From Swiss-Prot:
GO CC list: cytoplasm; cytosol; elongator holoenzyme complex; nucleoplasm; nucleus; peroxisome
Taxonomic placement: Eukaryota, Fungi, Dikarya, Ascomycota, Saccharomycotina
Annotated CDD domains: Elp456
Gene Ontology biological process terms, A to Z: regulation of translation; tRNA modification; tRNA wobble uridine modification
Highest taxon above the source species: Eukaryota
Disulfide cross-links: none
Source organism of the structure: Saccharomyces cerevisiae (strain ATCC 204508 / S288c) (Baker's yeast)
InterPro entries: Elp5, P-loop_NTPase
Gene name linked to the record: IKI1
Note, other: Present with 3870 molecules/cell in log phase SD medium.
Any one Gene Ontology molecular-function term assigned to this protein's record: identical protein binding
Name of this chain's protein: Elongator complex protein 5
Keywords for the protein's UniProt record, in alphabetical order: Cytoplasm, Nucleus, Phosphoprotein, tRNA processing
Quaternary structure, from the entry: Component of the elongator complex, which consists of ELP1/IKI3, ELP2, ELP3, ELP4, ELP5/IKI1 and ELP6. The elongator complex is composed of two copies of the Elp123 subcomplex (composed of ELP1/IKI3, ELP2 and ELP3) and two copies of the Elp456 subcomplex (composed of ELP4, ELP5/IKI1 and ELP6). The Elp123 subcomplex forms a two-lobed scaffold, which binds the Elp456 subcomplex asymmetrically. In each lobe, ELP2 is tightly sandwiched between ELP1/IKI3 and ELP3. The Elp123 subcomplex binds tRNA through ELP1/IKI3 and ELP3 and can bind 2 tRNAs simultaneously.
Amino acid sequence: MASSSHNPVILLKRILSLTESSPFILCLDSIAQTSYKLIQEFVHQSKSKGNEYPIVYISFETVNKPSYCTQFIDATQMDFVHLVKQIISYLPAATATQAKKHMVIIDSLNYISTEYITRFLSEIASPHCTMVATYHKDIKDENRTVIPDWNNNYPDKLTLLQFMATTIVDIDVVLTGTLDTEEVSELLNEFRIPRGLNNDIFQLRLVNKRKSGRSLEYDFIVNSNTHEYELLSTTKQEEESSSNGLETPEMLQGLTTFNLGTSNKQKLAKDQVALPFLEAQSFGQGGAIVYEYEKDDDYDEEDPYEDPF
């Protein structure tokens, strides 16, 4: 769990308004609670901050063009190559130094084959684009079972998406009335949708991957009518317990003859450390070992392959 120095509600608002840097936001929904209300929150928060981002909407399921989108692409009758070319034509070049941020909304990633999903996302990704894509958890990934010579050890589509995503938003329904989770699950398995689902008030779990390599996880109740976000009490208790478990000067006294404690300045510097994994696993390239040489490092001057400068 994240440290208590972060405000979870502010973090959620920054992600929804695209103020927080997160190139790929993955929304996981279901029949019980779709991502429609959450997408509306992205649009509302971005406008409330005074940011009128151009929105490119890629439709696999949506029939009518949403009023808020700038460009609408009907992807149902397009092949992979032409779809990527048309999307890129609406986005600024990745090498552009000054370009307005764009939002790309994909209403369903389930229609893209597992074989092409990583290539599709990597070709769209750029420093000037934030992708907000939905994946339906209720639909099983059947493509991987019919691809010839498919490696059984290769991960499924959902695992790939969760690995690539910089932010994961798992949406869940808030049940009202006499319905319980087990009853709703049984009805949905029989394709019987009870009343009281897809409410304006829903629950979501936020997983935000930081540049330092760790993840922040929070549970919220979202009211899409009032645009209010409430941190769940269970998450608050975990935050308090984790903060109680942090080191204090009193806990470390008498253990050694030297100081084991860290000052607030040192803790802040620790939180701002960025490990090289994000640079090594960026879009469009394979893994790499990233190391920055310093002048004091020892290296062999006669080795032609070891020239750090």
